[in-house]
Amino acid sequence: MSISQGVIRVPRGVQTAAGVLLTAGLVLAAAGAVVLPRWLGPRTASTPAGLETQADDAERLWRQAVGIVARARGVSTGEALIGSEWTPLVTTLGEAEAKRVSMSPAWPRALVREFHGAGLRRGDVVAASFSGSFPGINLAVMSAAEAMGLSLAAVSSVTSSSWGASDPGFTWPEMEARLVAAGALRKATVAVSAGGDGDRALDLDGDGQSRAREIAARCAGQLGARLIDPADFEEAIRARLDAFDEARAGRPLAAFVNVGGTEAALGRSPAILKVQNGWLGKAPFDSSPGRGLVARMVEQGVPVLHILHVRGLAVRWGIL
């Protein structure tokens, strides 16, 4: 399945079931609905010690990173992480407005608050799935994690929806490699894939496929990360779980953050269309063979933060 802001591409074989669920999913997304898990409990007016300092640090890291990308591209900071509508690496439609929303410096601050609310503390291991669709939010997750002293292990994909990290030379893994080389942020990515259909960009034409896979291989080398080039969907899932297992080195996963709509994260089952944005509940919602990382992490009892329909979440978190 491939999903971007405002557009959901339903995987082959589930179109009939998805027809009913799609409407409900879009209504929930438009409303910005979110389910807070039981472990968060009620929010209070108290501020954890150091939260605002960490939020300031996260915003500073984010702004510094955006500035580096802006200078490299020769554009303003407001346009630094917004790519072209169509390139050989674009797999799905997206909305330019949603990409602009994702460029707010309030995202790293909001994520520090959310991570504190979920009980995350220095040294905790957080797994993540980053597509190329929302590089601004990928950076926000990285900045918040670094400011809080979290150990972040991400699997990053090359392909993007339109207006995301869609330009060759400035795909998401290339951006991260540039920022890590500049010393702006600690490396987060532990594995890189081409993304798209089959996790091998099979929904692109021949030129797009070869470019995506070349970028994935090159960035994996630059970042000292695994290259994921799976034979099938199940192998794409296993490769990610193996990468997370290696990164956590026996420590428990404190949370899983999904940004964007990669097939491996969302899966091929229509059950994902019922999932709301934000922190997910603890009850498993999909047991099908086609379930993705989001469903499997919930199943394993790992707190999951799902960031896909960004405008609704931005309203709920006070970003808009």
Language-model region placement:
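N-terminal, Lys/Arg-enriched amphipathic/low-complexity engagement segments
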Residues: 50-106
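N-terminal Lys/Arg-rich, disordered targeting/topogenic segments
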Residues: 1-12
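Membrane-embedded segments
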Residues: 106, 113-118, 122-171
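Ser/Thr/Pro/Gly-rich low-complexity linker/stalk segments immediately outside membranes or between
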Residues: 37-53
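Solvent-exposed loop/turn segments at secondary-structure junctions
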Residues: 132-136, 159-163, 196-199, 262-265, ...
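Hydrophobic membrane-insertion alpha-helices, especially the h-region
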Residues: 17-36
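C-terminal functional extensions of proteins
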Residues: 253-255, 262-320
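A substrate-binding/cap region within the structured catalytic cores of diverse enzymes
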Residues: 169-252, 256
